[in-house]
């Protein structure tokens, strides 16, 4: 009986019954736990908050979409002229703006380079306008350089050659005298000349119109006399040597000036940006203007010579030694210096943006004694104020600090963040022991990052740049979005691929986002150390004032990392809990069976449906463990720490990077047409912006859903396809070509050659081959590759220029008379010569010197240049200078500029003079020039080492002079018969027959050059 009972108890049916009972008990317990959870279920509002802010795929994806859209909108609004600038409502300001706009229309009526009659028209218009305005005031006066009192001769800085420039100035100067004569004056400067190919509305018509607006304001009734004297410099010939500004340095009024505001235009419309400032002391006053817009990123570009064009700022700062700022329009550069820089392509708001900011800056500096006025008595203040300025703006808010202060902030953050982080890590890993980070966790982000950047670099330079190298000209934003989406997708695949391969690895998914945040902050920490070290030694040529966003990106990542570390340091977790539950909410996305999101688990509970055996909460565990861990993970899913980290890191980082990148690329992308080096730089910058923009999103990439992944794939695919299909040049983003028609009288007296400069690989050849004159005459197009990716294409043309109505032969355009050959044949004497250049209706000529021994000499043999005043000149076979040659010794003549008693302009340079540029105001007055140069035996060291005496010959020491003169007059030489007398018909042809995606600019000081070679 006992055996029977015992056998019955161990029978399969009995064991099945016990199993069923146990299962029933567990099911009952599970149901009770679920019921307990459901009974404590929060209300609808709390569930909605949890649904939005819980760490779920849908929530993260929603946050990412909102961030991207908000970033695009905010940056567009901040940089938008229409949104950020409002037209004046004040009656006086409205009147000033209307008058300035009318002035701008008058100034931009025609092209007005220094080499054109249009330049005289603008000068005369401004002179009449100034005279009218100053007649209203008792404390305003003017001065005109046209009386020849400010002609100068000076050395022009150039790395390739030594050039001396003679310039006759016709600047227009206005002095608004201040009530306190002890205060140093403020200079406001703009130039009224344009290039020959442009109407000069933005460059620099709006600067000139702003000067007139300032003058209009201070000459208006009811406006008090300023405390500080204000000098307005309407200067000429900025475009080809910054000559008007250089001339002003020699004017008596310059001695009063200590500060300056330079108004310029290196783009065509839009907003006027604060390009750069000499120092913090003066830049800080720009924060008081009503619509501040600027970034020291452009300052870094200028100071490091990434931007090749220069402004008068350079003259005032480097040669004049005064302190000020450079305010200019900065985009787009493909319209800059072309016929599209006209009144029809700009907005009155652009003028008001420059004019209002200029008025505000002038008002704040001139209405009071500023701290810079007293720096001579305060050395400490002087040291700080003369530091480089770091500045930026956003939504008309302006931020500026001195470089030393940013260095101090950087050093503090670099030290404090690790000091806080290290103790927290010690607490977490040595005491709490609640966070497991293994080898895979530590290396997967660096591996993913490096692989993604390498692939991105290959795609950028070997695919995009090879297929469509000029695409950034029209679509840099498309390339950024393509690379941005690709970079996110690559990291998504690499990170989750590693998770999939090592899915059985203990602790693989343990707070992955925090690991990535910490590693990202470490990368920024290293970069910030390098940047701070360089900023502490900041100088021109090695400027780092534009790298200020690094500290902000580092701080944002560090705050997110510290928040995560604090959370772990206060978390209570038992070892048993760790052993049984090493999985974490951040699951890999490639394994659907093992990694369901929390939202689905919660839905199962609330619906009463059975819990799936493949739940992510605990693999291969008992049902009670499943239930316990499920409820635990559901509670974890309600954690909002991720959302705090996301909000702290991602939105602001995206905004900073995108705003900085947008300003940088929109200002530089057109320079891809200027050189191969610029092209490489732009592609590198595009790649940098794409990577930096994507990095803040990477810690949260484990939780993006299929919708966002699909969107990224679509963006990448559409962008990649556009690389093959989209043209880099269109009507809004034209191909920029540079034109000059050359006549070389040594080669032909009836044939001219059109030279066109552009980038190699551009459609330039096709454009030129389609010109009617080439097709009709069957002239060949000769193209030669130049340095740095440029190309010169030339063709002969029968479209002769009509530079002067009285000239019928090319030889009449340029006649060089040799007035005097060497004054002595003595082999050790100073050789000298003298020429007169006759050119009709001309203002600019350039002379290049060589010698029969030039190739063997390390420097030019010309040492002295003399430019004669014809009314003082007395021709004599015995005199080169106004004194006897026997009385003249080279050592007695001071190096640099000097004048003799007859008014001759003399410049001496012992290092040699390679070129001389002559600029005069008279249209028909000849150039009268003298030279002194060294004979071979005096200048050549090699002669000392020769055993044989080479006899002295005059021919051996002849001075060769290449004379080239330029004309910039467009329009018609004879208004009675316009169809036949177009001044430069070859230029008219390229304008008329080029496609609408081509814009034309000048290559030289004029659109036509005539050259001739002589020896003396």
Curated annotation (Swiss-Prot):
It comes from the Eukaryota. Residues 1-36, 598-622 are annotated as: Disordered. GO terms for cellular component: vacuolar membrane. Glycans are attached at residues 147, 177, 473, 669, 778, 821, 850, 875, 977. GO terms for biological process: proteolysis. Its EC number is 3.4.-.-. GO terms for molecular function: metal ion binding; metalloexopeptidase activity. Keywords: Glycoprotein, Hydrolase, Membrane, Metal-binding, Metalloprotease, Protease, Transmembrane, Transmembrane helix, Vacuole, Zinc. Zn(2+) 2 binds at residues 203, 239, 337. It is found in: Vacuole membrane. Zn(2+) 1 binds at residues 191, 203, 264. Its cofactor is Zn(2+). Its main location: membrane. Residues 79-408, 460-481, 533-547, 668-681, 728-1016 are vacuolar. Residues 612-622 have a biased composition (Low complexity). Belongs to the peptidase M28 family. May be involved in vacuolar sorting and osmoregulation. This is Vacuolar membrane protease.
